[in-house]
């Protein structure tokens, strides 16, 4: 039974209301510093911890709760007579409910003007110590680190005579240990990122010790293949616009491959400005098989589907605008695993109501960029900054005698944006705001060029006057010859080959325009 509670919080969301309800249930309130003042100013009877222990706060508040009368009351096992006898001998009442959240260390070090002394002063000592004590003794003590749990605890107390069940206490305790682990991890990340002069400005993006925090969203029936087990975890620092922020409106549970492909589709489609045009991306095995722009979602989908209607079967489709009824009716004619959009109209949802296996994911558009990209290798982890660079037309360098026309420049920019999301080696033919042929994942660039050309022919699409993007430089002129023979009149590529002069000369020989980006988009 909860008779006495200690409340000491940095995040004061809902704390007054929670304390008022505790008081109404007859719970004695202990508190510290600003929390105690807030409760007292709100008319609640509260005892300062310094008065409770008979020992004043000291060292500028560094020592407040580090006292046997606090930790003894938290850690004592109520089922052990010797523990309870020790409390009685030293006149220590039990503390049955602990509500603590910690100094805002992560918010502090995120500030550009943060200094090492600022960071050090925001390392909480007393808070984690109390939290760990209470979580260790969760059989007898209820511990809250998240204001979202206030209502649950109050509900159980009201229903059970001020008692909280073991299952709830256990869940809250595991939440505490996860929270303190993340807190210590953030401190380690920060301290091991500092340069020799320990200045915030000299911080390395890659700390000596890297701690990451993820919460499990779901376990899956299997992984990439049926013999593999799998689960999906959400980054606790997921940025705006990230796939992990999805809300599933309908459909079966997402599989491992669904999520991997959905991420590829969403990252590609949100790279297009929704204010400029509707975009549709169709993904198969993490590669775009059709990408297009249109005046609306339906037009964008129709054009994207035409690129490769065979590969689109059972694919993942993403839009950067609301999916309306017209587009929904067109998509519903095909077999699709997952549909993603910033929103779905009521009429569009009604179209798919009869297709409950289709997964509808709603994700708000956002411009957040992940801090890191990861790739697991045997015994280690490769960490890099995301490939977030979008080349602007003003950055392009025309290296041929012929310059691209305005239409060709638009097609080149579109092709380059798509190529970034195609597995290397990538060759992408585009024209009129749509992909015409995609060659992906080949060991030689010339083979990717041939495949892209063949895909366009199979789809009945002409490549005459098309634009081509290559995610990396042409090592020889052979790849360029293939795309020109297929009908391309302009090419965009990074440049940087020792044979750039030979490739540029070949472009001039063919009379096409070529621009260099100076940026490569390898994708493995």
Swiss-Prot record:
E.C. designation(s): 2.1.2.3, 3.5.4.10
Pfam short name (any one): MGS
Similarity comment text for this entry: Belongs to the PurH family.
GO molecular function: IMP cyclohydrolase activity; phosphoribosylaminoimidazolecarboxamide formyltransferase activity
Domain MGS-like: 1-145
The encoding gene: purH
Database matches in NCBIfam families: PRK00881.1, purH
Keywords linked to the UniProt accession: Hydrolase, Multifunctional enzyme, Purine biosynthesis, Transferase
Keyword Transferase set for record: yes
Record bears the keyword Ligase: no
Positions of transmembrane segments: none
PROSITE patterns: MGS
Domain of life, source organism: Bacteria
GO cellular component, one term: cytosol
UniProt cross-references to InterPro entries, sorted A to Z: AICAR_Tfase_dup_dom_sf (IPR024051), Cytidine_deaminase-like (IPR016193), MGS-like_dom (IPR011607), MGS-like_dom_sf (IPR036914), PurH-like (IPR002695)
CDD domains: IMPCH
Protein name: Bifunctional purine biosynthesis protein PurH
Catalytic activity: (6R)-10-formyltetrahydrofolate + 5-amino-1-(5-phospho-beta-D-ribosyl)imidazole-4-carboxamide = 5-formamido-1-(5-phospho-D-ribosyl)imidazole-4-carboxamide + (6S)-5,6,7,8-tetrahydrofolate; IMP + H2O = 5-formamido-1-(5-phospho-D-ribosyl)imidazole-4-carboxamide
Domain notes per entry: The IMP cyclohydrolase activity resides in the N-terminal region.
Single biological process term from Gene Ontology: 'de novo' IMP biosynthetic process
Pathways per UniProt: Purine metabolism; IMP biosynthesis via de novo pathway; 5-formamido-1-(5-phospho-D-ribosyl)imidazole-4-carboxamide from 5-amino-1-(5-phospho-D-ribosyl)imidazole-4-carboxamide (10-formyl THF route): step 1/1; Purine metabolism; IMP biosynthesis via de novo pathway; IMP from 5-formamido-1-(5-phospho-D-ribosyl)imidazole-4-carboxamide: step 1/1
């Amino acid at each position: 039974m909860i008779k006495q509670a200690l409340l000491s919080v940095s995040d004061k969301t809902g704390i007054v209301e929670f304390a008022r309800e505790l008081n109404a249930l007859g719970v004695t309130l202990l508190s510290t510093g600003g929390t105690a003042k807030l409760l007292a100013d709100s008319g609640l009877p509260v005892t300062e911890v310094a008065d409770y222990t008979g020992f004043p706060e000291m060292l500028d508040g560094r020592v407040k709760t580090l006292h046997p009368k606090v930790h003894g009351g938290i850690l004592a096992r109520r089922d052990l007579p010797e523990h309870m006898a020790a409390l009685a001998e030293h006149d220590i009442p039990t503390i049955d409910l602990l509500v603590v959240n910690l100094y805002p260390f992560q918010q502090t070090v995120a500030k550009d003007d943060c200094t090492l002394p600022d960071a050090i002063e925001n390392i909480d000592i007393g808070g984690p110590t109390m939290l760990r004590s209470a979580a260790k003794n969760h059989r007898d003590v209820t511990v809250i680190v998240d204001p979202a749990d206030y209502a649950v605890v109050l509900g159980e107390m009201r229903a059970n005579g001020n008692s909280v069940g073991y299952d709830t206490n256990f869940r809250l305790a595991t939440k505490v240990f996860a929270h303190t682990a993340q807190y210590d991890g953030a401190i380690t990340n920060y301290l091991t990122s500092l340069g020799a002069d320990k200045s915030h400005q000299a911080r390395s993006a890659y700390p000596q010790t890297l701690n990451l925090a993820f919460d499990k969203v779901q376990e899956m029936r299997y992984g990439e293949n049926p013999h593999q087990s799998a689960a999906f975890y959400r980054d606790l620092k997921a940025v705006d616009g990230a796939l992990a922020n999805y809300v599933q409106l309908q459909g079966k549970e997402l599989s491992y491959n669904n999520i991997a492909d959905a991420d590829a589709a969403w990252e590609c489609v949100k790279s297009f400005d929704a204010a400029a045009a509707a975009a549709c991306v169709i993904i198969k095995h993490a590669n775009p098989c059709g990408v297009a722009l249109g005046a609306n979602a339906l037009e964008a989908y129709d054009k994207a589907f035409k690129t490769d209607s065979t590969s689109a079967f059972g694919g993942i489709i993403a839009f950067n605008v609301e999916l309306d009824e017209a587009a929904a009716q067109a998509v519903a004619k095909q077999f699709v695993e997952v549909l993603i959009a910033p929103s779905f109209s009521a009429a569009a949802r009604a179209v798919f109501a009869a297709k409950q296996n289709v997964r509808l994911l709603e994700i708000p558009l956002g411009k957040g960029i992940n801090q890191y990209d990861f790739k697991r290798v045997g015994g280690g982890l490769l960490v890099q900054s995301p490939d977030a660079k979008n080349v602007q037309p003003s950055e392009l360098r025309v290296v041929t005698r012929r310059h691209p026309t305005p239409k060709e420049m638009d097609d080149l920019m579109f092709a380059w944006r798509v190529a970034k999301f195609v597995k290397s080696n990538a060759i992408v033919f585009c024209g009129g705001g749509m992909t015409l042929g995609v060659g992906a994942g080949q060991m030689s660039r010339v083979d990717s060029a041939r495949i892209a050309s063949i895909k366009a022919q199979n789809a009945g699409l002409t490549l005459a006057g098309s634009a081509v993007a290559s995610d990396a430089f042409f090592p020889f002129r052979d790849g360029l010859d293939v795309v020109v023979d297929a009908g391309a009149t302009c090419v965009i590529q990074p440049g940087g080959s020792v044979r750039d002069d030979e490739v540029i000369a070949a472009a001039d020989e063919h009379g096409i325009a070529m621009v260099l980006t100076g940026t490569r988009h390898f994708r493995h």
